[in-house]
């Protein structure tokens, strides 16, 4: 919703009015909403825009727009077990006991990136979509570590890669070349 163009937002604003009527001036027609009409939208910035560059292209939504939304809900990440089930459902080759352990560890890595992001330690976060892509790439390449680097680590700030590699090592039990420990050995 916060990535919409202002001219579109003002059309939506009319629909969000209590009567929800919409006028088509060209046709001299008034459209009345169905009694069960509902409008849902997502907004990563909750209408506040984005000064960090994480959600580039979003706009600040004016207070008049925000006031017309009757319900605003915040959706955080799913519980660990539910996220594991979703990844397994999307990448069915992991539907084994060993596969579930790997997916669980992948979700643990994602959870650490989310905590690190919220604490300001890193600037990139793993979404459930990224975990699914990591699982798919790991399957394609036959290598979980390479899948991680190709899917997520290579997108991260170079200064943060050692910390993110540490997250990986903690959860996956495998050292990456990007980790601080590996760099110290070289």
Each model region followed by its residue ranges:
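C-terminal regulatory/interaction module of P-loop NTP-utilizing enzymes
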Residues: 1-186
């Amino acid at each position: 919703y916060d990535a919409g163009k202002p001219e579109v937002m003002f059309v939506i604003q009319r629909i969000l009015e209590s009567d929800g009527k919409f006028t088509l001036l060209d046709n001299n027609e008034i459209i009345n909403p169905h009694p069960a009409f509902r409008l849902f939208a997502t907004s990563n910035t909750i209408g506040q825009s984005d000064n960090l560059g994480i959600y580039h292209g979003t706009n600040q939504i004016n207070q008049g727009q925000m006031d017309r939304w009757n319900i605003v809900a915040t959706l955080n990440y799913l519980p660990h077990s539910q996220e594991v089930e979703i990844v397994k459902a999307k990448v069915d080759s992991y539907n084994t006991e060993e596969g579930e352990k790997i997916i669980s560890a992948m979700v643990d890595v994602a959870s650490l990136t989310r905590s690190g992001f919220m604490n300001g330690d890193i600037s990139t976060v793993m979404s459930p979509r990224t975990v699914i892509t990591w699982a798919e790439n790991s399957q394609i390449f036959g290598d979980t570590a390479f899948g991680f680097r190709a899917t997520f680590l290579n997108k991260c700030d170079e200064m943060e890669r050692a910390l993110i590699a540490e997250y990986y090592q903690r959860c996956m039990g495998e050292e990456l070349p990007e980790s601080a420990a590996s760099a110290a050995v070289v």
